[in-house]
């Protein structure tokens, strides 16, 4: 990713957090966090990584709500960030948080099984 793509991604991350928390009224979108935004080098596609508090069903519902609001979100981004063309937005779950939690759980299990001397 180029330096410009990184800057656009960081700005989009900030704006998306604001748009999702303040502008979207869809009840399917619960407690949601934008963890990362990766913009392609040509600034045409933005992959938005999200984390949702809750089970798999809540995650799927949040993704459906975001897909429904994608056009509105893209137009809001276009009005807030000066770009020739607003990137196409793709939402994906950020699996790294679940992976990190799983690793932490395994480490705690190993420590609890370790015999004390």
Swiss-Prot record:
Keywords carried by this UniProt record: Cytoplasm, Ribosome biogenesis
Pfam families with a match to the protein in the record: RBFA
Single GO biological process annotation from the record: maturation of SSU-rRNA
Cellular location(s): Cytoplasm
Keyword Cytoplasm: yes
InterPro entries per record: KH_dom-like_a/b, RbfA, RbfA_dom_sf, Ribosome-bd_factorA_CS
A GO MF term: ribosomal small subunit binding
Chief location category: cytoplasm
Top-rank lineage group of the source organism: Bacteria
GO cellular component assignments: cytosol
Family: Belongs to the RbfA family.
Function: One of several proteins that assist in the late maturation steps of the functional core of the 30S ribosomal subunit. Associates with free 30S ribosomal subunits (but not with 30S subunits that are part of 70S ribosomes or polysomes). Required for efficient processing of 16S rRNA. May interact with the 5'-terminal helix region of 16S rRNA.
Quaternary structure and interacting proteins, as annotated: Monomer. Binds 30S ribosomal subunits, but not 50S ribosomal subunits or 70S ribosomes.
Name of the protein described by the UniProt record: Ribosome-binding factor A
GN (gene name): rbfA
